[in-house]
Amino acid sequence: MRRAKNLLYVLTLMCTVSLAGQTRSELREMFISAEGDILFEDYAEALPKYLNLLQFFPENYNYYYRVGQCYLNTSGEKDKSISFLETAAQNINPQYREGKFRETGAPYDALYYLANAYRIGNELDKAIETYDMFMKEVDPEVYDTNLVRFQIETCYHALEMMRKPVYIVEKNLGDGINQRFSEFNPVISADEKSLLFTRELQFYDAVFWSLMKDGRWANPMNLTPELGIDQDYYTSSLTGDGKTLLLYRIDRYDGNIYESKLSGDQWSDVKKLNDNINTKYWESHATLSRDGMKIYFTSNRKESIGGLDIFVSERDSTGDWGPAVNLGPVINTVYDEDTPFLSNNDRTLFFSSRGHYNMGGYDIFRSDLDEKGEWGTPVNIGYPVNTTDDDLFFVPVGKGDRGYLSKFSSDGYGKMDIYRY
């Protein structure tokens, strides 16, 4: 108790000294700016602002809540959210006023986010207990309690799946590919000799290309200038022959799919796909069938069952993409589905979902095509490929018994590294 009082005294003293150099109106502007960042889900921008505000106001539990929320949405930093959310959850204001500078309490959401943080940290008993606590406190007409019940189910699924792990052999692609920043969204040709991925650089994200030579990956080349693009494009998929690259771009208020073609050793400028694929809604990922006649992609357009769904489109007589069709309720759920990929024989669909038999967040699933040409019930590919956090972008090779994936690891070269399974 004495230690806590001493800490509070030091923080209060820091506030007193700091306030002399920063006016209350400036702090209010900082708060408004941070709240705007949260609105647009720009947690990296919001975090230092809330940390600064917390130095000035160490007894404002709204700032503990916001800092915890930011860490929970920052890859590689999620474990830091727990202590802040625990503090916030002990100081709930039932009349919480979001966006108000004078608000000093935390909302009930702090409990929900704390439960998520426990789940991601594999503290599953604590997660279940905290989800239950949240359910007892909130009005079911205001909060989606069905989602909370589903989250509780995922915790029980996780406990079961972690007792029965699948056998995997995982290999980091090494420092020729992975560096101190993040490498993610790997896409690879069927012969596993052409690899493209997105790399986080100091000031922007860039598309890189590497070829396998003499059993080793050659030094990756930054393709961003050659593709005629800026930092808003991300690798989405690569055809088996390695000659057609699909990319995803955030275009102001929506996401769209683009393509580039390889001729010789030169990639073409990117071209936006037609209006049957790209709409005013959010298109986030796409992949092509082996013959290039079908495209599977994700969108939250009005025909979706819920959130992002997987759609398919076939080429018409002109060679362009025809109307898109929802894959239906066997694949799509009331929650999100994303990052679909096909095995090299087009018989197995791999994708990530928040709404099937999950162990937490997005999990990777596989669905096999039956004799009638219909996709079968999705099967979770298991732990430890799937975890209690979000798992996306599993790129299968061969018949899907092997694949590539990016993830954070304490023994990696940087943030996210690319692994082969």
Q: Which residues make up each language-model segment?
A:
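Alpha-helical segment of the N-proximal tetratricopeptide repeat
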Residues: 25-56
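Short, conserved micro-motifs composed of acidic
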Residues: 28, 99, 103-106, 113, ...
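Structural motif corresponding to the intra-repeat A-B loop/turn of tetratricopeptide repeats
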Residues: 40, 74-75, 121
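TPR-repeat structural position
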Residues: 43, 77-78, 124
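Conserved structural position within tetratricopeptide repeats
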Residues: 52-55, 87-90, 97, 102, ...
